[in-house]
Amino acid sequence: PQNFEQKIGFDSIRHLLKGKCLSTLGEERVDEMAFSEKYEEINERLEQVMEFIRIIQEEDEFPDQYFFDVRPSLKRIRIEGMYLDEQELFDLRRSLETIRDIVRFLTRTTEDEEMEESTSPYPALKRLAGDIIVFPQLITRINNILDKFGKIKDNASSELLRIRRELTSTTGSISRSLNAILRNAQSEGYVDKDVTPTMRDGRLVIPVAPGLKRKIKGIVHDESSTGKTVFIEPAEVVEANNRIRELEGEERREIIRILTDFSITVRPQVPAILQSYEFLAEIDFIRAKAQFAIQTNAIKPSLENKQVLDWRTAIHPLLQLSLAKHNKKVVPLDIELNYKQRILIISGPNAGGKSVCLKTVGLLQYMVQCGMPVPMHERSHIGIFSNIFIDIGDEQSIEDDLSTYSSHPVSYTHLRAHETVLDL
């Protein structure tokens, strides 16, 4: 049926996987996860997850800090005149460093003394990372622009360095002038001893009582909410404060120029960079599947390129998680179906577990063919089916039961019209 995933509970699996993703990159991959009937593809996906389980359990240095999705920003700068702002550039640098570090981690080799050659501890993941482009020159270029906190460096350009030096010099000059004026006003008793210069509307000013504001020549910029203080910009520093405003405008324009120039340089590389982020998305997705497998004690059973079920102690993962909250355990399931024994009839009383059994088979088989490990004994064998059909009604009331029963012949007709020996 069209609501097959809801019938077997796979929609809940997707939801749980999304919760384990580090970014929207991985979440999109969860949405795109699809059933496959190709043995090599399924086997490779399972191997990737099993290798990542080992990474989680055995490695402490896997680089997973910065899974930022900067694809929208990269796509935006394809348009002439658009540029990455400071935060976007910071996210780009950190995520590119993460991609670089992951590729290094997965493509490293160890010496095999018996084979007298170098081998990879994670061959399936190494194959995934093998052709991924990293961008060391781009990272270096960003490092020349941003400091370690993601702020534009003073020396990002010679012009910016000049502007910021003049800003520092002018601000220092204003502070010295204000302090001299303030000390004089304090000695005359116009201003309290504990008063210090403050900032109002981007200008350095002195707080003064309203009744004494004429004692200091200057411009009144603001007053406190209580009306007990006015903020005066002394006439001696007005011109210097104006220069500060001019320099701040120059600084903003120079930063935009730097960011625009960088974006122009990056623009031709955007398609290749986006491809590397697809790799980051895949790693996020595989990691989420590995985390879920660890949580549910899932393994990769012996995968066979034929239609067979030979499962030992198989467990419904959603039921397992639900019961674990109440310190209860699932009753495991053993089942065997093959080309000789192709039909299995399950009978029993109401609430005897028949529906759970059917859903367990459907869900676990679907999970495997979506590249997910499943909770069962490692000696289990699991095959591959072209299609999975299910006709199951959730019993809610007498009326619903009748309508559900009457729908069975329709479902059977559809099944008979489409089934093959390759289906479950």
Describe the function of each predicted region.
Residues 1-155, 159, 163, 269-272, ...:
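Conserved amphipathic alpha-helical "coupling/scaffold" segments
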Residues 413-420:
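Conserved small/polar residues in nucleotide/adenosyl-binding loops
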Residues 366-406:
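P-loop NTPase switch/communication element
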Residues 327-380:
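P-loop NTPase nucleotide-binding module
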